[in-house]
Structure formats: C-alpha cells, structure tokens
A protein has these predicted regions:
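Polynucleotide-recognition surfaces of large bacterial nucleic-acid defense/processing enzymes
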Residues: 180, 191, 195-295, 368-373, ...
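Amphipathic alpha-helical repeat scaffolds
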Residues: 296, 300-305, 351
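Conserved Class I SAM-dependent methyltransferase catalytic core
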Residues: 79, 167-175, 183, 323-377, ...
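Short secondary-structure boundary/capping segments
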Residues: 54-57, 139-143, 180-184, 216-220, ...
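Class I S-adenosyl-L-methionine
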Residues: 1-159, 173, 302-306, 331, ...
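Flexible, glycine/threonine-enriched loop-and-boundary segments that flank and lead into catalytic domains
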Residues: 101-122, 267-299, 311-319, 329, ...
Length: 441
C-alpha cells in the first residue's frame, strides 16, 4: 500500500477534510485530481522531514520528497490554455475550441498561416510528477482533434502516441502518470490495454557500469561504442540531475539502439549481466532522445530547491551559472531552450525571480530573448503547500515587444479558490483594475 489507512490522521484524513468534493467525481475527471492529491499527501510527512533537516543540502534520494507539489487544477488549466490552447488558436482563431478554454486570458493572438497538423503538436512536462498537466493537456488535445474531424478513439490513441511527452526522477510518480494517461486513453478505447500502446514518458535511471567485457559484446563501429560510453557518463548522476542534464545534439540514437538490442534480447544469459546493462542503456537512450527534441509547448511546475547537494550544485554552477540561485530558475531557462521558436513555455514558480538581485541575470535573459505572454502574481500566502509566494506565467519563444497580459492578485486573500474566482472575473471583464495589458519593457 502507498499509505496506512486511518481516518484520524494521515492521507485519508487529508482527503476527507481538504480535497474538494468534485475532485472525487469521475464524471468530472476527478480521478486524475485524486491521484495527484493522494501522492502529495503521501509525500507530505517525508517532505516536511526533508526540508527541515538542519537546513542542509538535500540528498539525491530525498529530492522527490523535497520538491514534489501537486499543481492546483486552475493553475494547470491556465498554463495549458494559454500555451497549447493559444498555439491552436493562432492557426484557427475562430474555432469553437476557444470557448472551451476556461482560463484563456484576454490578449492578442498572432495569426500563423503555416501548415498545421494536429498529430505533430508536441507537449512536454519535464517534471511531470503524477501527471496532472499531461492529463489536462490530453483533454484539450481531444477538443482540438474533434475540431479537426477525428473520431474519439483515433484521437485518443494519436494523443498518447504523438502529442504528449514527460520526464520524471521519481519512479512512483512516473507510475502514477503512466496510469493516469492510460486511463484517459481507455475511456475512449476499451481495448487499449490489450495492445502495445505506451505513453511517451520516461523515468530517469542512473547509468550502469559499462565494462570492457560489455563493450566487446557489441557489434558496432568505434564511433557508436564511443557514444554509448559518452551517454552512460552523462547519465551517471541522472537520479540527481534529471531533466537538466545537458546532452549533445548529434547522437546517433539509431546506431546505438542497433548495437544494444541484440544483446538486450539475447537468449543466452550472460554471466556478466550484459543483457541487463543493454536494457538499461536502451531505456536511457529513449529518455535522452526525448530530452534532445524541441517542443511546441513545454509546461511544468518545476522543483523548488536551493539547498542543493554537492553533485547538483557543481553541475548547476557549471552549466547554468547565471540561473543557479534555485533549481526552479534553472528550469525556467532550460525549458525555453527546449521550446521551438514561437512555441510556448508555461510555469508555476516562486515569484522571487521577478524582484531579487540573485535572479537579475535570469530577468535580463528573459527580457532580451523571449516574450512574457501572460503572468499571474498570486496573493502572498495563497498556495499554502508551497510555503513560498507563487506566480504562474507563460513565455513565448520569440523576440518581440507585443503586449502581454498581467494579473496582480496580491490584494485578494482567501486561498487558491479566491484566486481562481478573480482570474475568472478578469476573463469576463478585462476592465478590472488588477488586469494590466502592457509590453515587458
């Protein structure tokens, strides 16, 4: 079991007293909400223990407990509606899809006359947790496929196989994401679990030791052998570094797979564990290939962590020096570079990056290279689970001085439900005093 059943304390008590009733309603897509809340409450005690240990660096095994927070539903909808939703409306501005994007903020939509194929729109969450963002993106994509004339069963299978991608360092969270997406698919295709349809999501594993004996078992060129050794070196600390690992753009993934697959599937068992090593390396290659793609939309609630252990701190200082104040700021910059030109990146992060000197280089880089398409500054204590003041925002990977949309909710106390109500009021009446339309300079 994930937890000890108890109605007096622990997970069940939290579910009964803290989770909105609608989140239990399967007809209202409540099953995904419940998976997320279950995992957050399951992690609540270890999270509190980890973040309060003498104020010291967080160990690799404790990073998931220290950094995982379930993203509030309306924030997920805001991020996806204003990134994936907006991407679609750039091609189809008069589509009825617009009316289904409940959290689409008022703002300009730049027409895009280029060819559009819904099966080629790719959405990434590279800190996916229990899959809340990807699950909602699935729903939005379903409305788009239907708008394009697809049958629901065909659309659902295409979404799982072509549109959604995810990365995660914690295996249990990965398993919940996998389950959530497969349940989404099964809703439209009852036979889905009987076929080999699999979501494009991956969990990070540390690279196995690549011995000389193992390398001798491979039938491959010296160039491919070198690449296998190189990718293994990059993933040595994958359980610590996860999605921020920087990889070469020109790996010969097909060549590496061709070298490893015969060993991974060999009938004769190797005394040296070569099959297992090859299988693990194939898993790493699939993860790496996902990491080195660029996406139309990247949306995530990144980890918030400034108490980095020595391995993470050294890597961040080397590869992300200007953004190293906190792990969330590393993700802000990293994810922009994961996004295609004119693509969108959505985030929920602490709002200190907008004000504090240690994030000045991040602010300068963003203002010089991307457009802040929209931003919502939440009331200081609205998101209690994060223990820090939060904002949520969407960046567009383009240099321009077009007008963005900003909501300042700092005057509205009462938690996340009040914040959601104020967002809805601003969407219904863009003339409210806390909505601003301005460029970022």
């Amino acid at each position: 079991l994930l937890f000890t059943p108890s109605y007096q304390n622990g997970v069940i008590k939290e579910l009964v007293t803290e989770v909105p009733r609608d989140d239990f309603d399967v007809e209202k897509e409540g099953q995904v909400e419940i998976i997320g809340w279950l995992y957050q409450y399951y992690n609540e005690e270890p999270h509190d223990q980890v973040v309060n240990i003498n104020g010291g660096p967080v160990k690799t095994d404790d990073i998931p407990a220290a950094t995982q927070l379930f993203t509030t539903d309306w924030v997920v909808r805001y991020m996806v509606d204003n990134s994936l939703g907006k991407k679609y409306l750039e091609h189809y501005p008069d589509s009825p899809v617009k009316g289904k994007l409940k959290y689409l903020l008022p703002g300009d939509i730049t027409p895009d006359q280029s060819d559009f194929d819904i099966t080629r729109i790719q959405v990434m969450d590279n800190a996916m947790g229990s899959g809340h963002i990807l699950a909602y993106a699935f729903d939005v994509l379903m409305t788009m496929y239907e708008d394009q004339g697809y049958a629901k069963r065909e659309a659902a299978n295409s979404i799982i196989q072509n549109n959604l991608f995810g990365l995660e360092i914690d295996r249990r969270a990965f398993q919940l994401s996998y389950f959530s997406l497969m349940m989404k698919l099964r809703r439209y295709d009852r036979q889905a679990l009987n076929r080999s349809v699999m979501p494009n999501i991956h969990v990070f594993i540390a690279a196995p030791a690549v011995t000389e004996e193992f390398l001798h078992s491979l039938k491959a060129s010296s160039e491919v052998i070198d690449e296998i050794q190189d990718i293994a070196a990059h993933f040595m600390d994958a359980k610590t570094l996860g999605s921020i690992i920087e990889l070469p753009a020109n790996y010969d993934y097909a060549g590496m797979r061709n070298a490893l697959e015969p060993v991974a599937t060999a009938q004769k068992i190797s005394l040296f564990g070569n099959q297992q090593t090859a299988q693990q390396l194939l898993e790493i290659i699939a993860t790496a290939e996902t990491m080195t793609q660029r996406y139309d939309v990247v949306v995530t609630n990144p980890p918030y962590l400034n108490k980095m252990n020595s391995t993470l701190k050294k890597y961040v200082k080397k590869h992300y020096k200007d953004y190293s104040a906190d792990l969330f700021s590393v993700f802000i910059w990293h994810n922009i570079n994961m996004t295609k030109v004119n693509g969108y990146a959505g985030y929920m992060t602490p709002f200190v990056w907008m004000f504090i000197k240690s994030y000045e280089k991040l602010r300068t880089a963003l203002l010089s290279n991307v457009k802040i398409d929209s931003l919502i500054q939440l009331e200081y204590s609205a998101f209690e689970e994060a223990t820090v003041p939060i904002n949520t925002f969407v960046l567009k990977n383009t240099k321009n001085d077009e007008t963005g949309t900003y909501l300042r909710l700092s005057d509205f106390k009462g938690g996340m439900m009040i914040q959601a109500e104020k967002v809805q009021e601003a969407i219904a009446d863009p003339g409210v005093k806390y909505l601003y339309r301005t460029n970022q300079t």
